[in-house]
């Protein structure tokens, strides 16, 4: 099954008349991962569902299919819509479990585990501070199963918070969303002014296509085909042994989507072994504002290209524009010289990016009255 990414906001810091702040949905074979949920997220989510119903018959984004909410960091343009959305799902009597994940600092983890106040050095935008505040504002009264897990990504150290007490217990590792058997969610450390990480959804390698032509040549029955397709060997009545591996091509390579969140260009932890099929990377500033990008640990479009090369991405999509960037085309124009063969697209609100099993990427551009598809040839 393909990975279908819905980008519901491409503005940075605050909404504009044409752009909302961050919030994306990544739909894969196991369910939906929500990456960030800025101001007004639940309204934008509901509108996208209505768009699908009207313009993409048969495609859905059911809230009951959301298994995980993962924050890239704690700045409010990435988090401020989360608690209202969670409370709305509770009012709608949600029963499905939800995993909530986010990065924090070692100092915050230590304080939570020791049941002591957070140190002054822990910034207001740290997710540890926010979550404790959310618990006091009703987050501790949600009635559906929910796990609150914070981690020091660089140290791979994770704790689960108790919303009733504010305490926590250490975990052996970062948990995966419940029911995910065909995909994995992974944090990728980034470089920002508060604890941060990107999130990568990777679909596992899948079996190659079933060789129908060979099955036709052998005159196999429907039952025999089904057995071989399931990986079961068959002993035929004439004594012939048919091995399932003879009817499958080689495994298809895993495909993946990495959403960076806010970050400076080329985080030190990024390595080309990560190799996402698609990187969705922030592009907050214009090239002329490089000093400002460095100061606030953000990126330009050209910086995003450098990040894509550092992490071994096959395709790059830009998002998270400052209000000085009136058109996403501006970002693309500024980075066209340095892209040098890397497939790139500039996103707008409500666009979709579909990563197929074989690694092709389609940019579905929202026009206001449906989506138009642009095929992107991966750089592989």
Set out the residue ranges of the language-model regions.
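Active-site-proximal loop/turn and secondary-structure-junction residues that shape catalytic pockets
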Residues: 285, 322-323, 350
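Mobile, glycine- and charge-enriched loop segments
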Residues: 263-297
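A conserved acidic, glycine/proline-rich C-terminal tail/linker
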Residues: 318, 322-328
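Binuclear metal-dependent hydrolase catalytic cores
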Residues: 1-258, 266, 271, 326-380
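Glycine-rich S-adenosyl-L-methionine
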Residues: 295-311
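Conserved active-site loop/cleft motifs that coordinate metal ions or position small ligands
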Residues: 278-281, 316-320, 343-348
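Active-site flanking residues adjacent to catalytic metal/cofactor-binding acidic residues
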Residues: 35, 72, 261, 281-282, ...
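Conserved acidic residues
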Residues: 67, 277, 314
């Amino acid at each position: 099954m393909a990975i279908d990414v819905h980008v519901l906001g491409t503005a940075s810091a605050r909404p504009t008349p044409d752009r909302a702040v961050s919030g994306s949905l990544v739909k894969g074979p196991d369910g939906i991962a929500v990456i960030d949920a800025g101001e007004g997220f639940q309204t934008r989510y509901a509108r996208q569902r209505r768009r699908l119903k009207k313009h993409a018959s048969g495609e859905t984004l059911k809230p009951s299919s959301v298994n995980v909410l993962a924050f890239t960091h704690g700045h409010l343009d990435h988090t401020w819509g989360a608690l209202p959305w969670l409370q709305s799902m509770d009012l709608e009597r949600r029963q499905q479990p939800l995993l909530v994940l986010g990065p924090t600092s070692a100092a915050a983890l230590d304080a939570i585990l020791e049941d002591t106040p957070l140190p002054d050095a822990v910034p207001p935008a740290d997710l540890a501070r926010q979550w404790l505040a959310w618990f006091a504002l009703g987050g501790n009264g949600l009635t559906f199963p929910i796990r609150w897990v914070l981690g020091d990504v660089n140290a791979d150290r994770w704790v689960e918070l108790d919303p009733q007490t504010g305490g926590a217990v250490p975990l052996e590792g970062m948990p995966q969303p419940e029911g995910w058997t065909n995909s994995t969610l992974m944090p990728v450390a980034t470089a920002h002014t508060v604890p941060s990480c990107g999130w990568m959804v990777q679909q596992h390698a899948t079996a190659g296509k079933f060789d129908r032509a060979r099955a036709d040549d052998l005159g196999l029955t429907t039952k025999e085909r089904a057995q071989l397709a399931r990986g079961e060997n068959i002993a035929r009545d004439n004594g012939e042994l048919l091995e399932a591996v003879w009817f499958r091509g080689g495994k298809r390579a895993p495909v993946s989507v990495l959403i960076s969140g806010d970050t400076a260009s080329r985080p030190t932890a990024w390595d080309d072994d990560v190799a996402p099929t698609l990187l969705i990377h922030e592009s907050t500033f214009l090239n002329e504002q490089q000093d400002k990008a460095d100061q606030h640990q953000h990126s330009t479009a050209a910086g995003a290209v450098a990040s894509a090369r550092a992490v071994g991405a096959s395709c790059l999509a830009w998002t998270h524009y400052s209000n000085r960037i009136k058109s996403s085309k501006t970002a693309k124009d500024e980075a066209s010289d340095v892209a040098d063969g890397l497939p790139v697209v500039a996103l707008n609100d409500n666009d979709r990016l579909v990563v197929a099993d074989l690694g092709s990427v389609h940019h579905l551009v929202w026009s206001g009255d449906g989506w138009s598809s642009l095929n992107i040839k991966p750089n592989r």
